[in-house]
């Protein structure tokens, strides 16, 4: 029946599409026509846009009438809300054209995307020093391929609209029927397969896709994380909440409580373990800050806590705000160091993964080169770092974090306040003398805090010899929960830092770690290393044969991490 329908409709397709081809004016690009053919899709699920994506390329396009981008790369935008953007620049040296996807909620090159709902890319001039600068945005398929500088070139043939309306219904019937059939077959297969699964089979195979309710699908990966999600970095807007059963309280902080919980399936008693961070009604702002940070899809990284979704819930205790994330059974780093002495290899893995996570947080691009908003944590400490099953770190607790949006004014940054935990505050934060003109100074406060955490790790490493009981940075020099004034006396007046015993330096790898953390807690923020530099240094520690040039000692670190004194 399906084949007969296709055969019957095919001649009509040829006739109608021939009419379309004959009525398209030469100046109307493919992207505009594609949008017209889409019809009115209000009420349908919004799919990611298809845009030209060539970043910055040299162009011969002038700014008089209109032109094509000549970009050969078409990309599906990562997020449904992203639109197509084109940027045309002319300076004394050349003309360049940039085509990308971008979320209109955020500025691009410091400008708001005011025309993000336009079906065509009509250039508007922006004021920029030293160059002629035009930018446009639009929300139809590949609409940034056809760049318009004069709005009279945006008109299209009235006959074209009528023809396209006629052909749309006929064109969509065959693929729609095929799609429904494929979905039905796949659904039946999934239901049949799920019913046949047994616990013994599950325990002997790699963990696969598991469906639950209509909210989202969860992909269970390897032992590096207990859970990850295809709908990660999203807030759950569905009226039906995720089927979660709270288990035990595993942590409590200033703003929220953290529970171990069971995420149940619809059709069985099986469940997966997740963590649920619950904020009371009065801590809405902290929940919103952390939710907004997690909702940035470019934040995803193996050394940043895996986010599942965020929910608003009504309980007998009143309204609550939930963040649902991966659960890591080893707990936070402070707890882990209190209970365990670590080896040199453990220290290298923990330190390296911590630096990589912070470097990604601070970076203005993803590892694959996509633009990303830099973020500063502002409350880095060992209790805000989780230990994964493979003994690597992941950052969590972003309730005090700050997005370094270039559109923020100095006043906006000044109003962000003196935040963090006093024991881990950098000197300039304690003294409230941050350089608000330079956003890099915010990142360097995180680097200072990271140095203290690296010291904590090193103090519990058996490669240095005698290992004392765990103590936080500054140990008994300050009380258990020191105030800002107490830390000012220690850090500013006395220029105090945690002690590095001389025998730690007998191990070549530990010596490099100590040199690194000493440079990271320098009193001068501009003299500190960047998180990326620290990550690179730890990467070098994976190759002991390359370390001789970094130390006075000519001895090498063998695979077991001990100091090799063999000549």
Swiss-Prot record:
Q: What is its main location?
A: membrane
Top-rank lineage group of the source organism: Eukaryota
Q: Where is this region: Disordered?
A: 546-567
Q: Which InterPro entries match?
A: Kinase-like_dom_sf, Prot_kinase_dom, Protein_kinase_ATP_BS, Ser-Thr/Tyr_kinase_cat_dom, Ser/Thr_kinase_AS, Snake_toxin-like_sf, TGFB_receptor, Transform_growth_fac-b_typ-2
- Record membrane topology: Single-pass type I membrane protein
Q: Which GO terms describe its biological process?
A: activin receptor signaling pathway; animal organ morphogenesis; animal organ regeneration; aorta morphogenesis; aortic valve morphogenesis; apoptotic process; artery morphogenesis; atrioventricular valve morphogenesis
Q: Which cofactors does the annotated protein need, by name?
A: Mg(2+); Mn(2+)
Q: Which residues form the active site?
A: 379 (proton acceptor)
| Key word Manganese present | yes
Q: Which residues lie on this side of the membrane: Extracellular?
A: 24-166
Detail which positions bind ATP. 250-258, 277
UniProt-annotated glycosylation sites, renumbered to this chain: 70, 94
Which Pfam family would be a valid example here?
Answer: PK_Tyr_Ser-Thr
Q: Which UniProt keywords apply?
A: Apoptosis, ATP-binding, Cell membrane, Differentiation, Disulfide bond, Glycoprotein, Growth regulation, Kinase, Magnesium, Manganese, Membrane, Metal-binding, Nucleotide-binding, Phosphoprotein, Receptor, Serine/threonine-protein kinase, Signal, Transferase, Transmembrane, Transmembrane helix
The record places the following residue ranges in the Cytoplasmic compartment, namely 188-567
Q: Which GO terms describe its molecular function?
A: activin binding; activin receptor activity, type I; ATP binding; glycosaminoglycan binding; kinase activator activity; metal ion binding; mitogen-activated protein kinase kinase kinase binding; molecular adaptor activity
This protein is called TGF-beta receptor type-2
């Amino acid at each position: 029946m399906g084949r007969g329908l296709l055969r019957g409709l095919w001649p009509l397709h040829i006739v109608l599409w021939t009419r379309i081809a004959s009525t398209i004016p030469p100046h109307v690009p493919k992207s505009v026509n594609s949008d017209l053919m889409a019809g009115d899709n209000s009420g349908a699920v919004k799919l990611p846009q298809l845009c030209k994506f060539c970043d910055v390329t040299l162009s011969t396009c002038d700014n008089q009438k209109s032109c094509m981008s000549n970009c050969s790369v078409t990309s599906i935008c990562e997020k449904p809300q992203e639109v197509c953007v084109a940027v045309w620049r002319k300076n004394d040296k050349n003309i360049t054209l940039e085509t990308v996807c971008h979320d209109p909620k955020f500025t691009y090159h410091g400008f708001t995307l005011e025309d993000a709902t336009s079906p065509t890319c009509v250039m508007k001039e922006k004021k920029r020093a030293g160059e002629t600068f035009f930018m446009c945005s639009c929300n139809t398929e590949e609409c940034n391929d056809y760049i318009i500088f004069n709005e009279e070139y945006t008109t299209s043939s009235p006959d074209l609209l009528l023809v396209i309306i006629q052909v749309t219904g006929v064109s969509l019937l065959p693929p729609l029927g095929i799609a429904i059939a494929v979905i039905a077959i796949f659904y039946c297969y999934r239901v049949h397969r799920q019913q046949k699964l047994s616990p013994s089979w599950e325990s002997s195979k790699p963990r696969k896709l598991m469906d639950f309710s209509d909210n989202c699908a969860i992909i269970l990966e390897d032992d590096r994380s207990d859970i990850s999600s295809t709908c990660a970095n999203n807030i759950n807007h569905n009226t039906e909440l995720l089927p979660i059963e709270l288990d035990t309280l595993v942590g409590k902080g200033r703003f929220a409580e953290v529970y171990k919980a069971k995420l149940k399936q619809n059709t069985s008693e099986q469940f997966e373990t997740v963590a649920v961070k619950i904020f009371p009604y009065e801590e809405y702002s902290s929940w919103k800050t952390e939710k907004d940070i997690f909702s940035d899809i470019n934040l995803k990284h193996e050394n940043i806590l895996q986010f599942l979704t965020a929910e608003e819930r009504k309980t007998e205790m009143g309204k609550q705000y939930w963040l649902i994330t991966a659960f890591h059974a080893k707990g936070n780093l402070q707890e882990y160091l209190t209970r365990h002495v670590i080896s040199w290899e453990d220290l290298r893995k923990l330190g390296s993964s911590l630096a990589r996570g912070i470097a990604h947080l601070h970076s203005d691009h993803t590892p694959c080169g996509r633009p990303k908003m830099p973020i500063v944590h502002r409350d880095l400490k060992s209790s805000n770092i989780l230990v994964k099953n493979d003994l690597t770190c992941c950052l969590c607790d972003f309730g005090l974090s700050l997005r370094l949006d270039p559109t923020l004014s100095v006043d906006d940054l000044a109003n962000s306040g003196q935040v963090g935990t006093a024991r881990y505050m950098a000197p300039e934060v304690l003294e409230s003398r941050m350089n608000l003109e330079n956003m890099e100074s915010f990142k360097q406060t995180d680097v200072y805090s990271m140095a203290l955490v690296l010291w904590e790790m090193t103090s519990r490493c058996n490669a240095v010899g005698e290992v004392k009981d765990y103590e936080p940075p500054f140990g008994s020099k300050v009380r258990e929960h020191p105030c800002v004034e107490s830390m000012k006396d220690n850090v500013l007046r006395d220029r105090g830092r945690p002690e590095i015993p001389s025998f730690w330096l007998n191990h070549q790898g530990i010596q490099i770690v100590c040199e690194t953390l000493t440079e990271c807690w320098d009193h001068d923020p501009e003299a500190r290393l960047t998180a990326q530099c620290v990550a690179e240094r730890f990467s070098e520690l994976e190759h002991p044969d390359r370390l001789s040039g970094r130390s006075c000692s000519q001895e090498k670190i063998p695979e077991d991490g001990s100091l090799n004194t063999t000549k």
